[in-house]
């Protein structure tokens, strides 16, 4: 925040020549590597850039960073969906039982179960939500790992 508030006052770090002494030394050391044959000669190999990818690396990288996580997500979201489905059915059956008992007390004829549709609606909503999450993830990342 100080750098943003007082950007003009940073000139005092410069020496007389106007260069950043410590920064120049750091940049020169970072660009020099001891295994280069001649530091000051232009690199001729830059024109012949090898863009081939090691097959083993490509497969293992794709597996570790995409396919295995997708498999884990599918298994996890399937389990979440099944647990949610069981919970929704339990709650719906309790709601139906309470509604049924209340309707039988208030009138002579008992009303039919109507919350079964609501239960199915809740299940499909959970399924749609999980499908959208998985679908967006796969659609965004699959082209990168196929190409």
Swiss-Prot record:
Protein name, as recorded: D(1B) dopamine receptor
Extracellular side of membrane: 13-55
Bilayer-spanning residue ranges: 1-12, 56-78, 129-147
Record has Cell membrane as a keyword: yes
A Pfam entry, by short name: 7tm_1
Residues carrying a glycan: 54
Record's keyword terms, sorted: Cell membrane, G-protein coupled receptor, Glycoprotein, Membrane, Receptor, Transducer, Transmembrane, Transmembrane helix
């Amino acid at each position: 925040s100080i750098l943003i508030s007082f950007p003009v006052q940073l000139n005092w770090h410069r020496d007389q020549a106007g260069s950043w002494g410590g920064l120049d030394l750091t940049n020169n050391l970072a660009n020099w590597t001891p295994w280069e044959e001649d530091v000051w000669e232009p690199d001729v190999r830059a024109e012949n850039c090898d863009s081939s990818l090691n097959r083993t690396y490509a497969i293992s990288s794709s597996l570790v960073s995409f396919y295995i996580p997708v498999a884990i997500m599918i298994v996890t979201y399937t389990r979440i969906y099944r647990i949610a489905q069981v919970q929704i059915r339990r709650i719906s059956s309790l709601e139906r039982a309470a509604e049924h008992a209340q309707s039988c007390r208030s009138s002579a004829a008992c009303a039919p179960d109507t919350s079964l549709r609501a239960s199915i609606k809740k299940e499909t909503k959970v399924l749609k939500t999980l499908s959208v999450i998985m679908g967006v993830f796969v659609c965004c990342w699959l082209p990168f790992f196929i190409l």
